[in-house]
Regions:
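Left-handed beta-helix
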Residues: 1, 22, 29-58, 153-154, ...
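Short, conserved catalytic or adaptor-binding loops enriched in Gly and charged residues
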Residues: 10-16, 172-175, 243, 248-256
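Conserved core of the sugar-phosphate nucleotidyltransferase
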Residues: 64-66, 85-88, 94-227
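Conserved catalytic-core segments centered on acid/base and nucleophilic motifs
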Residues: 71-72, 81, 184, 209-212, ...
Length: 390
């Protein structure tokens, strides 16, 4: 998790400390998804251990074998989704689905992710104890899960067009053996995928990986440096590209791991990585069921891409207000909103504001009575030189 969320996570979510453990990456170095996995395992093993001086790597095999666990990577800085950077994207509040039953007004990205991950773990063979997933996606499976084969690594993917696959990791399998990984690519070009389609099938990586204890131990081994510290190691480019029948990275130990690739039945992939994706993904989820007999929420919004949660809005929204997200805020009658506006955390006010297209406002409480306003642009990336206007 982000460092500021670790200590208050249990209070915010009412999570049981016996069921949940959270930590953040060290502040002095970047670890990547592989190194971050090793760090999370190390921190959790040491937290569980009565002997803090014990070697966590020696305890790793027995600890892994003890029970099944879900590892969720949600520690990003959320630079492209500033509205939920303080709490982490994984706690982004998600509007109830107009077609959904059993929804909660307090639901967030984390609570929506877990049911699928739990179903997968219940279905997984007894040899697979570890599931690793990303914290900034919502993945749905509208159909029952297939049987999960015995393998050191089992990865789920989606059938997608090359145009979408080019932005993600891709599992490539031979047409005569579609469940067996031949090799993995990272962000391949459309032309590259086009050349493969005669003899190969490809699935987009959706970030759900099941690992055997042996696979986890090798992932950790490659993440730990000679001095015993954990360094940068990427699970997808470094570890993933060493998997399959014809891997691009030659490593005898990793090359020997057996790998199975499964298409997620009725799968949907919704990314919550940016401000735009937060709205577009939520809209896509709302529209995943269009049968009016299944839709229980009968109110028609001025525009489908308007989302209002836990908010007092005295300003009249219109069809011109497109890609608008208002949460935990007071928007008074003297406000004027346009499009691509994200308003979060605004306290009760009597302000007269004209929020231009693409302007977003987040307000963070400081101490008992103070607030800090954080204006930003809808498409701001918050990267590069601080003096750069972009």
């Amino acid at each position: 998790l982000p460092p500021n969320l670790v200590e208050c996570f249990y209070d915010i979510t009412n999570a049981d400390r016996k069921e949940w453990f959270c930590t953040s990456d060290p502040k002095d170095r970047k670890l990547g998804s592989g190194g971050g996995t090793a760090w999370l395992l190390k921190e959790c093993i040491e937290n569980d251990s009565d002997n803090q001086q014990a070697d966590w790597q020696q305890n790793l095999p027995s600890w892994l074998a003890a029970e099944k666990r879900i590892l969720l990577h949600a520690g990003g800085q959320s630079r492209r989704l500033p509205s939920y950077a303080p709490s982490g994207k994984v706690l982004t509040p998600i509007p109830i689905f107009r077609w959904g039953r059993g929804q909660k007004l307090t639901q967030n990205l984390l609570s929506l992710q877990l049911p699928l991950y739990n179903r997968i773990m219940q279905k997984a063979p007894s040899s697979l104890h570890t599931l690793i997933a990303s914290g900034d996606v919502y993945i749905r499976a509208s159909k029952p899960l297939q049987e999960i084969p015995e393998a050191d690594v089992v990865c789920y993917g989606l059938w997608v067009d090359p145009e979408l696959a080019k932005n993600h990791g891709v599992f490539v399998s031979r047409r005569d053996n579609p469940e067996r990984l031949d090799f993995m690519l990272q962000k391949p070009s459309v032309a590259e995928l086009g050349k493969l389609m005669r003899d190969y099938l490809f699935l987009m990586d959706i970030g759900i990986w099941l690992l055997s204890d042996r696979a986890v131990e090798l992932l950790v081994k490659h993440s730990v440096k000679a001095d015993g510290s954990i360094g940068f190691y990427d699970m997808y480019t470094d570890f993933g590209k060493a998997l399959g029948d014809h891997p691009s990275i030659i490593d005898e130990e990793l090359n020997s791991l057996s790998v199975a690739i499964l298409p997620l039945p009725g799968g949907e992939f919704h990314h919550y990585g940016t401000s735009r994706e937060m709205i577009s993904s939520t809209l896509a989820v709302q529209n995943s069921v269009i049968d009016q007999r299944e839709i229980m929420h009968l109110k028609v919004k001025p525009h489908p891409s308007i989302f209002v949660q836990n908010t007092k809005v005295e300003y009249k929204l219109t069809p011109d207000n497109q890609e608008v997200w208002i949460e935990n805020s007071h928007v008074g009658s003297k406000w004027q909103l346009h499009s691509k506006n994200i308003i979060t955390g605004v306290p009760e006010n009597d302000w007269e504001l004209n929020i231009a297209d693409g302007v977003c406002i987040d307000v963070v409480p400081i101490g008992e009575s103070d607030f800090v306003a954080r204006p930003y642009g809808f498409n701001d990336m918050f990267r590069g030189d601080i003096t750069d206007d972009n």
